[in-house]
Amino acid sequence: MIALIQRVSEAAVRVDGEVVGQIDKGLLVLLGVEKDDDEAKAKRLMERVTTYRVFEDSEGKMNLNVQQVDGKVLVVSQFTLPADTKKGTRAGFSRGAHPADAERLYDYFSDLCQQVLPTERGRFAADMKVSLINDGPVTFWLQV
């Protein structure tokens, strides 16, 4: 399971012109689910995402996590993250989970986040338009 996390001052996701998820200060989490992922991996990744220190303390060091700054999380499914890009000019998607499994684990991950801090989400498998103001920019790839 993969999370591409971005520190944002704001982010929103729209489907058919309607805002379905929106946050101010926090993390935009693009979540990719791989074939062998399960609830244990989702829980471990949620723990890493919500405790990963990406926000600056009073000395300007990235020592604070999203919970410590009263931030929020916006989780967006991203089936292209597990893609195989090693050869050629077109990505291969065989490493991604079956859509039903991916949706179940996406929902599970999002629900776990919601138990820890305010969480918004995109709409699984929808054609989404994601807008954000990346603060920094600060972006990390987390994988379990």
Curated annotation (Swiss-Prot):
Q: Where in the cell is it found?
A: Cytoplasm
Q: Which GO terms describe its biological process?
A: D-amino acid catabolic process
* Motif extent (Gly-cisPro motif, important for rejection of L-amino acids): 136-137
Give the catalysed reaction(s), semicolon-separated.
glycyl-tRNA(Ala) + H2O = tRNA(Ala) + glycine + H(+); a D-aminoacyl-tRNA + H2O = a tRNA + a D-alpha-amino acid + H(+)
**Which top EC class is given?**
hydrolase
Q: What is its EC number?
A: 3.1.1.96
Instruction: Kindly indicate whether the keyword tRNA-binding belongs to this entry.
Output: yes
Molecular function terms, GO-annotated: D-tyrosyl-tRNA(Tyr) deacylase activity; Gly-tRNA(Ala) deacylase activity; Ser(Gly)-tRNA(Ala) hydrolase activity; tRNA binding
Q: Which PANTHER family match?
A: D-AMINOACYL-TRNA DEACYLASE 1, D-TYROSYL-TRNA TYR DEACYLASE
Annotated function:
An aminoacyl-tRNA editing enzyme that deacylates mischarged D-aminoacyl-tRNAs. Also deacylates mischarged glycyl-tRNA(Ala), protecting cells against glycine mischarging by AlaRS. Acts via tRNA-based rather than protein-based catalysis; rejects L-amino acids rather than detecting D-amino acids in the active site. By recycling D-aminoacyl-tRNA to D-amino acids and free tRNA molecules, this enzyme counteracts the toxicity associated with the formation of D-aminoacyl-tRNA entities in vivo and helps enforce protein L-homochirality.
Provide the domain comment.
A Gly-cisPro motif from one monomer fits into the active site of the other monomer to allow specific chiral rejection of L-amino acids.
Entry protein name: D-aminoacyl-tRNA deacylase
Q: Which organism is it from?
A: Vibrio vulnificus (strain YJ016)
Gene symbol of the encoding locus? dtd
